Structures are given as structure tokens and as C-alpha cells.
């Protein structure tokens, strides 16, 4: 039984970390209520990056560090590329929000550790904001598109996590799709099951 200051605590776990955990602000709670869940490096190597800053998270998620406990795991890093048609149709189907052909995907907010919790989607028929971890994962996953992982390709209906970045794919000046690069599998709060095996 785990306790904190003499009281039994709630515990959370997930499959695989990207090299960083997050805290309960991911689910809209406060760290004051759950001070024992903290955002920190999984493997003890602090890269000196502020992962709530988009450019610094971009550097983090596109890199790999052999000291990370989950480094050898399949979903430590993953990426997928969806055409404008695929991502737009999948987004409308998953969210019930039709913004038309998606033109831009912008992360508006990341919580401690780097997980995205608010994403603005702009299309040729309007824009909308997706503002929860589970909704973001559902909105951009696609079971019909290959996802590249550390051990080959697979497919997921939902994104493995929101520890990810969105980039436009173009041919010349024409937008043809979006690449999603991410890491980890699960919400990222508490204990990584794969890291616990180390």
C-alpha cells in the first residue's frame, strides 16, 4: 500500500513513457491535491528543457536518449503521416465537428512534462478547439494509416499519447497533409509499466 503524509494515495499507471511524465493538470486537477504526481524525466537525465514551451518540446520529442527507461520500447517514439483528406475526415468523424479541409493544427497549451491539452484546428469551413487529452487522442488517430514505431509499423484508432507535435506536409506550396511525431503510450501520469521492468 502506498501512502503520502500518512494517507493512502490514488495510484495511476500507463504503458510506456516518452522519457517524461506529467502531472494531474493533464486532467484538469491541481498539483496541490495530488502533490505526489510530478512531471519529471524517466531515467534521471534532465535535458534542461522546458517542455511546456512548444519549440523546446519539439526538440525533446524528436530526439532520443538511451538513458530513458523506455528507450527500447516500441512506442517510445512514433510518427504517422495523414493526408489532408484522411485527417479532415477522421477529425470530423471522431469529434462530430466539421471544419472542412484542415489547414492548420496548433497546440495552444501543454502541461508540465509536455503533454498537449489544448489544440486549435483550423479548416476551410471554420475552426474549433479540442481541450482534453482523451479528445485529442481520439481526434487525430486513424486506424487506416500506418504508424511508424521503433519496431516497425502498426495502426491505432487513437493517438498513443498527446506527447506529440503536429507539422504540415507540403509539396511545393501546396499543403498535402500533416505529420504527427510523438512518444509514449498512455496518459503519462504516475508509473510507466515498461519503465518499471528496468
Spans of model-derived segments:
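Conserved, single-site charged/polar hotspot
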Residues: 1-198
